[in-house]
């Protein structure tokens, strides 16, 4: 234990001397503390051969606090009046430069472009100025503002519709390009359209005549067939009636034949 106390006194004495040196002379740099024997107690006490546990923990805590707070003992260096005067002059120069910087910022072209008011705000300001000069009623002011807003909305809707039409046409063309392997068909000329129309008319007339001629030729044939069927039916009916009439008549030859047989 005496050995450890002697080591702590040595380390404590060195730190106190360093503190006194820093307080007296602020211009000198602080020498770095020597840490040759700082790891000795930890290594010896970790083996568990010397001292009690309570004393060991207290010594370790004291050493840690002394090593962690070296800046608390340092004093803030005092400024001379000459240095204070120089600082004041520099601050006044910086404060005088601020308005010039603001003027330069206000003269920037991009700043003007970005901070320019919108068309709606301009119209609203103009309408407010006109209303204040003329001294009209509030209803007229409201109508003017509403008309301006509606006009702007119509313009925006028209632009959107144009853009949508353009997008649709582009998508349609792209689909045609991908679907048609041979690409786009050539645009038909006026002669081709006229020739096609004439050919279509001729074909229609030919088909119409053929259909109606077939119908007209079939009509008399059907009539004849129906008449023949009717005449045949009448003949058959007449023959059947004649046969019935002939069977009901009495023939003398029959009676004579019967008598002869008896």
Curated annotation (Swiss-Prot):
Involved in the control of root gravitropism. One of its GO terms (biological process) is regulation of growth. InterPro entries: LAZY. Residues 1-40 are annotated as: Disordered. Belongs to the LAZY family. It comes from the Eukaryota. A motif (IGT motif) lies at residues 43-49. The keyword Chloroplast does not apply. This is Protein NEGATIVE GRAVITROPIC RESPONSE OF ROOTS. Keywords: Growth regulation.
